[in-house]
Amino acid sequence: MKLQDSLRKIIRQSGSGRWVQGSGAVQGACDTLPGDPGAGGSPFLMKLLAAAVLLAGGLASGCASDASSGEQNPSLAAEAAESVSENQKSGIRSGGAAGSPSYARAKGNAKLTIWVADYQGYNGIAKVGERFTRDTGVKVNVVHYGQADVQFQYASAAGVAPDIFLSGHDRFGEWAKEGLIAQLAPGAEEKARFTGLAWDAVTIGGKIYGYPMGIWALGLICNRKLVPDAPENWEDFIALDNKLQKKGVRAIYWDYTTPYYTYPLISANGGYSFKKASDGFYDTGKTGVANEGAKSGLKFLIDLIWNGHMRKGADYGVMQQEFSGGRLGCILDGPWSWAGYDQAGIDFSVNRLPKLNGMRSRPFVSVQSFVISASSPNRDLAVDFLENYLLTDDGIRDVNDDVAIGVPALRSFQALSGRNSRIAATMENVRGGDLIPSIPEMYRFWSAFQTALREAVTGRQGADEALEDAAKGIAKQ
């Protein structure tokens, strides 16, 4: 059935097609996360929005491109649907292996489609895909999106998901619950090749749902020319800013109204999102976003801003621009940004996050991992590609040479990267960080904490009141 027919069928089932009018669905796909307030959460609306989004050519050309050719892809929905159709004809089913009859029939006939975000080294993945094609005859199509997680969830609901998808682990719990991603069964030898932390991130309820690649955590990134020695304490930035302002430069800036970036300040003295209970599951009825440690962190941020040591108005793009232009001493950013600062000609260091009140900041830790769509008829091919081609020293090198993957989850490549000071510093931040809980309730945390940050830094609410309101919203059942 064509995707257009699928949309018509869904509309007929609903009795109304009014939800797919104008360009609202397209805009929402790029800018709104499923589960956020106003995004719509029912299975029917998800499927309807998915079909509408994927049918819209404007979204495909505006949010994604074909990594293989570097050209804009006019219809990713058609590409995905074609891939599913071709692979179904090949007779590939889950549970096969290289050398099995189903695998043999796939050669020269099937196609693996891989979706990644714009910042995730798609050129390197495409390079590995070319080797896989030469060896097996199976075509590999690598597609990249601006809002990749959003597109994956919509495409899964519409039945046109890619075979493989690269994402941070924090959505896996939700996707596993919704049946969007396949449970995996790597052998003991395969598991031994990766760090335990990486497997912990992709394990939901004792079951594995992803193959880990790189581990991300924020670091304190400093321009060596302006700040030869990175500050050890957050409090040190006050004197440093007084000094650098005389040169027309600011000491520190980051996207401080985005929870991911400001979490290190509230976590330094004991703030947290959710903690695991004794049964191994997160206690979502309790949050540490409003404890005394969290409040002290937010108050310090407010003081930095209102005492003139950090510009008013948080903007990630402005931060990148100012740092790339040599007008910022230090920023908070992650491995995905390193290549851009290198290209800008900035000699920078990556350092451990500073201490606040003598306690080390704890960043959120994200494990970038590959999942296999539950609807993919090519799980055996996908596993072969991931285990024997991409997640090897040669494969990871190709991806890392394109865009830094952070701390390698692959032990052997981690050993090869041991002398890299950026990776070493990121490793320290990872070890001292908090793994992002892979639970749907994190939406409450992101939303409520962001509101608290915006209210507090603008003075509309005090730090205590803003965080206490956030805690009520986060811990609601």
Which residue stretches match the model-derived regions?
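Hinge/lid segment of periplasmic solute-binding proteins
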Residues: 84-108, 169-219, 229, 234-241, ...
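Extracytoplasmic "Venus flytrap"/periplasmic binding protein-like
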Residues: 127-194, 209, 224-228, 232, ...
